């Protein structure tokens, strides 16, 4: 059975999404088209085995305001793209914005890119990410040891948890952000128990997928405190100062905007952090004009100066509404 048109709703899973458009390409006669959140046209979605598909994406229309297409809030906007049966090394991009015409632009030709590069439809952010990619990535920090990966810090068995503390037991936070709810486990029964003696920043794996790094969903744990369940460790430090600075950084508006442009699969992936600059957390980082020492003796570093961002770029990032249609 063959159809002239197929209307589908691809699942929000990166691998299944690729399967969906790959099969559509095979079955289409001349072309296929898609309306998806802009981040689904991200090159990080495509592996070296599926990158060839991008050569068939020839035209892209980017709607900065999602309300131009759907009555929803999507932080990275919406794209309509056309996939033909003829491959090419370039694609054409057009920008639409009903609320602010200065963000509209006519057809511009761009190279398709290489595996691992970032496909970005928002031209205002292109220059910013050209600067960010020159800095160490938080993703590489997460991958430096396997204990930073999701589900790798689970205890062997939840049945080993108990409410009364023994001689060599370790307290376990039942919630990554609620250290008042504590159970105990013998140190020998834990995975990566050596990192129990670090100051840690943790987050729920599900909240990582939704880019929801809020006060409630990110935990700052002390030495000697572990955690279990669907949690991931985003940092482990020798000092509480480094932990606190990392904790504040991951909850910042800047981090929420940068990570919202990346796709996370159904299992927490470090790719979510690939565009996020890794910083020296001996210092606290702010969008400020100069480095300064506050009344508590904390050194505040200028994030925008370190990254080489202009005042206009800083203002643009600060004004971006995370999760709203004016993005």
Protein language model annotation of sequence segments:
Residues 1:
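S-adenosyl-L-methionine
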Residues 4-83, 246:
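Conserved Class I SAM-dependent methyltransferase catalytic core
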Residues 9, 27, 249, 302-306, ...:
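Generic, well-ordered alpha-helical scaffold segments in large soluble proteins
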Residues 35-36, 234-236:
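Conserved beta-strand segments of the P-loop GTPase G domain that flank and frequently precede/overlap
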Residues 37, 86, 319:
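Surface loops and adjacent helix of pleckstrin homology
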Residues 41-42, 210-212, 324:
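Flexible loop/turn segments at secondary-structure boundaries
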Residues 67-229, 235-311, 315:
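C-terminal substrate-recognition regions of SAM-dependent nucleic acid methyltransferases
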Residues 312-327:
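Short, amphipathic C-terminal "tail helix"
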């Amino acid at each position: 059975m063959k159809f002239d048109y197929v209307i589908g709703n691809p699942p929000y899973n990166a691998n299944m999404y690729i399967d969906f458009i790959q099969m559509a390409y095979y079955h289409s006669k001349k072309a296929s088209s898609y309306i998806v959140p802009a981040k689904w046209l991200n090159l990080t979605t495509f592996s070296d085995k599926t990158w060839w598909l991008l050569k068939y994406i020839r035209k892209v229309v980017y709607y900065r305001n999602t309300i131009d297409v759907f009555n929803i809030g999507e932080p990275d906007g919406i794209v309509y793209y056309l996939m033909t049966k003829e491959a090419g090394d370039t694609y054409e991009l057009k920008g639409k914005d009903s609320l602010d015409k200065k963000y509209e632009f006519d057809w511009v030709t761009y190279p398709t890119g290489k595996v691992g590069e970032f496909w970005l439809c928002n031209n205002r952010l292109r220059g910013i990410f050209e600067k960010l990619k020159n800095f160490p990535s938080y993703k590489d920090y997460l991958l430096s040891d396997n204990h930073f990966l999701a589900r790798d810090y689970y205890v062997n068995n939840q049945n080993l948890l108990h409410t009364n503390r023994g001689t060599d037991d370790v307290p376990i936070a039942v919630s990554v952000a609620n250290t008042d709810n504590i159970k105990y486990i013998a140190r020998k029964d834990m995975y990566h128990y050596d990192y129990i003696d670090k100051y840690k920043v943790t987050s729920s794996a599900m909240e990582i997928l939704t880019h929801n790094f809020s006060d409630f969903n990110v935990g700052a744990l002390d030495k000697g405190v572990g955690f279990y369940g669907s949690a991931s460790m985003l940092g482990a430090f020798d000092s509480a100062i480094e932990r606190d600075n990392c904790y504040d950084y991951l909850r910042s508006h800047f981090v929420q905007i940068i990570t919202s442009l990346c796709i996370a699969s159904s299992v927490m992936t470090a790719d979510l952090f690939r565009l996020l600059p890794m910083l020296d957390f001996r210092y606290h980082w702010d969008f400020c004009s100069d480095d300064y020492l506050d009344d508590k003796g904390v050194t505040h570093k200028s994030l925008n100066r370190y990254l080489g961002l202009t005042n206009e770029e800083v203002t643009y990032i600060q004004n971006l509404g995370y999760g709203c249609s004016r993005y």
